[in-house]
Regions:
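Phosphate-coordinating loops and pocket residues in cytosolic domains that bind phosphorylated ligands
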Residues: 139, 202, 329
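Pocket-lining segment of extracytoplasmic ligand-binding domains
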Residues: 91, 98-99, 171, 177-267
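Short polybasic/polar patches that bind polyanions
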Residues: 64, 104, 159, 202, ...
Length: 338
């Protein structure tokens, strides 16, 4: 991923023993210096190109270097990570803006503290041969993960084409299962994101009818935390945000050392991974600071939040428009280390 473009006994004795254990295992590079006082920040992430940099953060010990006590938890299923955050099993999670607003509509109290990226092609509605437009999905079986990002994209493009969700036969499947079902010919189309797009497009004659490239800013990928945890532990959140931007800097400066980590976490080949580059626009620190400000396009998080809130109610993914007045917390990007 071309991050360089504009576009993831006594305390002393215990520490000494831990260091010796790392040395003995030949893992000195993975040993982090003792973090500052505060609870461990439990951070969830899942398969998405804009979140794979977190694997570099962990592998290169960047949480510790920034003084953060943080632990990453990988989820094979994206929805599982959202549910874990809502259940208090995580303190922060990597998730989209629309899914965060859906959670708030369901009663969750969450804050956005960082924008990792926005999708510029890696979310796709993929269809079988013979289906040449979104309008052609009418009456067809279409799979996606219900209530999450590509279900949102599917409903958005259906609405733009003058259709409703009821005009298709919706098949709710986890994203990986949706890609597999489409590749096997069990459904006519699927809404999936990278890296699952690679599997879906192996079906002969298949093609993307539309992608997030045609909907700039509609899908923002974020670090979202429980408001209660943010209020109690702002210093720890700040250090986590600092570690993210340190990670982007390292990926830019040392591509040979970091690319293998990104590729391994993605589970695809290096050429396949590099093909995702244009479809995920990583947001720099300067872009984060700008995007948290009010604006009139979907790249402005305040504007996008209002637009998405209205849309979720219109298509039935939320019963009422949620209160998002405290959703965006710009303080951590505003105070992040340059």
């Amino acid at each position: 991923m071309n991050i360089s473009s504009s576009r993831r006994t006594s305390r002393r004795r215990t520490t000494a023993l831990a260091l010796l254990a790392c040395l003995g295992a030949g893992l000195l590079s993975a040993c982090q210096k003792p973090a500052a006082d505060g609870p461990v920040v439990r951070i969830g992430y899942s398969a998405w190109p804009g979140w794979f940099p977190w694997a570099v953060t962990e592998a290169k010990g960047l949480f510790g270097k920034e003084g953060a006590a943080a632990k990453l938890q990988w989820f094979d299923g994206y929805l599982d990570s959202i549910n874990a955050l809502n259940a208090g099993q995580l303190d922060c999670n990597s998730q989209t803006l629309n899914d965060t607003i859906s959670s708030i509509a369901g009663g969750a109290d969450l804050q956005v503290v960082l924008q990792n990226d926005y999708s510029t092609g890696n979310d796709q509605i993929i269809a079988a041969s013979g289906i040449n437009s979104i309008a052609g999905l009418k009456g067809k079986k279409v799979a996606a993960e219900e209530g999450t990002v590509d279900h949102y994209l599917l409903l958005k493009v259906l609405k733009d084409a003058g259709l409703k969700g009821s005009d298709i036969t919706f098949v709710p499947l986890e994203t990986g299962a949706a890609a597999a079902a489409f590749a096997a010919g069990k459904v006519d189309a699927a809404g999936v994101y990278a890296p699952f797009t690679t599997q879906a497009l192996k079906r002969p004659g298949s093609k993307a009818l539309t992608t997030s490239k045609e909907h700039p800013g509609a899908i923002s990928d974020l670090l979202v935390c429980r408001t209660e945890f943010v209020k109690k532990n702002p210093d720890q959140i700040q250090k986590v945000v600092n570690a993210w931007f340190a990670t982007l800097k390292l990926i830019k400066q040392e591509p040979a050392a970091t690319l293998p980590i990104l590729v391994q976490r993605s589970g695809v080949s290096e050429p396949e991974f590099k093909a995702y580059d244009a479809g995920t626009t990583i947001q720099t620190l300067a872009e984060n600071r700008q995007n948290f400000k009010p604006g009139t396009t979907m790249t402005s998080l305040p504007y996008a939040s209002q637009q998405i809130s209205t849309f979720l109610v219109e298509v039935g993914l939320a019963k009422t428009k949620p209160d998002i007045s405290n959703l965006l917390n710009a303080s951590f990007v505003d105070n992040a280390k340059e």
